């Protein structure tokens, strides 16, 4: 999932809130800043243009500011701002005149001008004599977040997340109950693993919001706290005494997700982790918590930078992300030492060897069928392979496409990163599975006459338990649930 798509998902939730709830949200300057960051560039421009205007603004004026080929973006931005209740009808009540929501306008002005913000951005604990290092915060948040991901993919010998986290995973449809009460990953869960860390966090937090509403928790308090976390400063301690009862309850849950850290000896303060600061960040999305944290730490440790090193760093980041090469013979090489990435691969790849910085395996009919039977689709497997393809595979695909375009500029082929034979075979394995559906039931044969066969088969069809029949061979198949009814019917009418 791209960063834009995750923003759209958050906006969809916010747009669906009642106007009264939206207005209460805008009383918090930190929330106003976070929502502003989630808007499209054009909507941001309109907000800034109207922020210091004391009179109504005409929609015709906004239309004049936009190029003719950007009318769709204009309509989308206006619709989004209206749905969020950021713009309302002008004071003059004349058509086509609008103004900023006065509550949002006041709070957002305070953000930009340093006005009254009422601890909206947290209350810093000045008496923090033993601060927690950023390295400790980074390690803590990565362990907590990736514990959740490891549990989802079934990595052996890993810790189990807290009970509330498991409830959330099940409630959100990312995992479902299997045999013996254990949880297993679902189709949606595998799609969740394909997302970047920002989208993963917001996916769970939006489900947390829905669960919070059913638990009678104030959604405004919940949202304000989440948006506040995204605006706090890494490495600073913040007091808990200004938090509402709802937000105090959230502290334990946010600890389980790795968004905040608290010393066991001092629960009066909390520290936001780097994952929390990414919640409303406009920086690029990362594929995992480890990659996000390692990227920041690597930049902090750099003392010199040359052009050659830059390319090496980029390759290293991709390698940490599990860059892989797949051949036409279905052999796969993944340059990763991450247990999480290896566990995800094991869901649909038959792994053979593991080295210090690489694992090898092969896509087989059985390994892919096992993934398909567990709810993972062929398109999701293909998407994962494309997303994590090695830069050299992408470069080779681009070169091949360029050569085809040179020979025939009208060619309509798209960039094929993966070997076509591999992509086609994965889809064929799914089609093969879709053609075969198994049912438990009973086969009826050896009827004395065609009339006897037809009468019993028609009865089975009428009561909806007939699954298959062959008139030439005078046989049919009924479900387990309907077998007793068909037997009783046969005894009443044909047994002497």
Swiss-Prot record:
GO molecular-function terms, A-Z: ATPase activator activity; double-stranded DNA binding
InterPro entries listed in its UniProt record: Tfb2_C, TFIIH_p52/Tfb2
Domain of life: Eukaryota
Keyword annotations of the record: DNA damage, DNA repair, Nucleus, Transcription, Transcription regulation
Subcellular location: Nucleus
One Gene Ontology term, aspect cellular component: transcription factor TFIIH core complex
Keyword Nucleus: yes
Biological process per Gene Ontology, one example term: nucleotide-excision repair
Family according to the record: Belongs to the TFB2 family.
Function: Component of the general transcription and DNA repair factor IIH (TFIIH) core complex, which is involved in general and transcription-coupled nucleotide excision repair (NER) of damaged DNA and, when complexed to TFIIK, in RNA transcription by RNA polymerase II. In NER, TFIIH acts by opening DNA around the lesion to allow the excision of the damaged oligonucleotide and its replacement by a new DNA fragment. In transcription, TFIIH has an essential role in transcription initiation.
Assembly and binders: Component of the 7-subunit TFIIH core complex composed of XPB/SSL2, XPD/RAD3, SSL1, TFB1, TFB2, TFB4 and TFB5, which is active in NER. The core complex associates with the 3-subunit CTD-kinase module TFIIK composed of CCL1, KIN28 and TFB3 to form the 10-subunit holoenzyme (holo-TFIIH) active in transcription.
Listed name of the protein: General transcription and DNA repair factor IIH subunit TFB2
Organism classification: Eukaryota, Fungi, Dikarya, Ascomycota, Saccharomycotina
Gene encoding the protein: TFB2
């Amino acid at each position: 999932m791209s960063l834009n798509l995750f923003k759209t998902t958050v906006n969809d939730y916010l747009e669906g809130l009642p106007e009264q709830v939206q207005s209460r949200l805008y009383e918090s300057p930190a929330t106003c800043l976070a929502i502003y960051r989630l808007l499209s560039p054009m909507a941001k421009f309109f907000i800034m243009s109207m922020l210091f205007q004391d009179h109504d603004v005409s929609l015709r004026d906004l239309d004049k500011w936009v190029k003719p080929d950007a009318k769709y973006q204009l309509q989308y931005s206006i619709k989004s701002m209206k749905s969020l209740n950021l713009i309302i009808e002008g004071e003059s009540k004349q058509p086509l005149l609008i103004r900023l929501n006065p509550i949002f306008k006041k709070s957002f002005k305070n953000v930009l001008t340093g006005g009254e913000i009422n601890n909206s951005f947290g209350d810093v604990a000045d008496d923090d004599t033993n601060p927690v290092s950023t390295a400790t915060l980074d390690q803590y948040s990565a362990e907590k977040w990736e514990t959740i991901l490891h549990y989802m993919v079934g990595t052996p010998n890993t810790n189990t997340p807290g009970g509330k986290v498991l409830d959330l995973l099940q409630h959100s449809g990312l995992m479902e109950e299997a045999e013996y009460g254990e949880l297993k990953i679902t189709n949606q869960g595998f799609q969740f693993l394909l997302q970047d860390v920002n989208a993963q966090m917001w996916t769970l937090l939006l489900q947390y919001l829905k669960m919070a509403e059913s638990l009678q928790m104030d959604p405004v308090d919940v949202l304000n706290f989440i948006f506040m976390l995204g605006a706090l400063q890494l490495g600073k301690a913040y007091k808990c005494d200004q938090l509402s009862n709802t937000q105090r309850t959230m502290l334990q849950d946010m600890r389980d997700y790795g968004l905040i850290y608290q010393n066991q000896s001092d629960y009066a303060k909390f520290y936001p982790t780097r994952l929390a600061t990414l919640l409303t960040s406009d920086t690029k999305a990362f594929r995992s918590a480890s990659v996000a944290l390692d990227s920041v730490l690597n930049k902090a440790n750099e003392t010199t930078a040359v052009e050659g090193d830059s390319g090496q760093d980029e390759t290293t980041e991709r390698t940490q992300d599990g860059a892989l090469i797949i051949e036409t013979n279905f052999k796969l090489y993944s340059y990763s030492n991450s247990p999480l990435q290896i566990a995800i691969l094991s869901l649909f790849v038959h792994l053979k060897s593991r080295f210090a910085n690489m694992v090898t395996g092969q896509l087989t009919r059985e390994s892919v069928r096992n993934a398909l039977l567990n709810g993972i689709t062929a398109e999701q497997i293909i998407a994962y392979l494309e997303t994590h393809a090695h830069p050299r595979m992408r470069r080779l695909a681009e070169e091949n496409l360029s050569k085809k375009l040179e020979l025939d500029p009208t060619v309509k082929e798209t960039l094929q990163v993966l070997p076509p034979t591999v992509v086609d075979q994965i889809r064929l394995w799914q089609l093969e599975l879709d053609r075969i559906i198994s049912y438990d039931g009973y086969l009826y044969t050896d009827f004395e006459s065609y009339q006897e066969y037809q009468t019993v088969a028609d009865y089975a069809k009428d009561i909806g338990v007939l699954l298959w029949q062959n008139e030439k061979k005078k046989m049919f198949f009924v479900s387990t649930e309907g077998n007793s009814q068909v037997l009783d019917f046969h005894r009443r009418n044909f047994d002497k």
